[in-house]
Amino acid sequence: MVKAPRGYRNRTRRLLRKPVREKGSIPRLSTYLREYRVGDKVAIIINPSFPDWGMPHRRFHGLTGTVVGKRGEAYEVEVYLGRKRKTLFVPPVHLKPLSTAAERRGS
């Protein structure tokens, strides 16, 4: 038996699959241009249409984190993986807003 290769996207067949109605559709322009501020809570949801644009590893799909800063076009997002704190550089295409810092302050 030959050992199975362990590439970066292995075991992602179901994880990186779009629903049937979304296949072939282009995301809204606001998805690319969305601005986040430091302290905003975001969810890391991988968009499989953009594999070459800073796609995070599959272990981070579905995790929530806090925006810590911006680096180039990507955002620095701090997430916890178990007890360990990780800093990821994720473009806005793979992020979804949960709440903003202003909403939590009540203004």
UniProtKB/Swiss-Prot annotation:
It comes from the Archaea. Gene3D superfamilies: Ribosomal protein L21. Keywords: Ribonucleoprotein, Ribosomal protein. One of its GO terms (molecular function) is structural constituent of ribosome. SUPFAM superfamilies: Translation proteins SH3-like domain. InterPro entries: Ribosomal_eL21 (IPR001147), Ribosomal_eL21_arc (IPR022856), Ribosomal_eL21_CS (IPR018259), Ribosomal_eL21_sf (IPR036948), Translation_prot_SH3-like_sf (IPR008991). One of its GO terms (cellular component) is ribosome. One of its GO terms (biological process) is translation. Signal peptide: none annotated. Belongs to the eukaryotic ribosomal protein eL21 family. NCBIfam families: PRK04306.1 (NF003303). This is Large ribosomal subunit protein eL21. It comes from Aeropyrum pernix (strain ATCC 700893 / DSM 11879 / JCM 9820 / NBRC 100138 / K1). The lineage of its organism: Archaea, Thermoproteota, Thermoprotei, Desulfurococcales, Desulfurococcaceae. The gene is rpl21e.
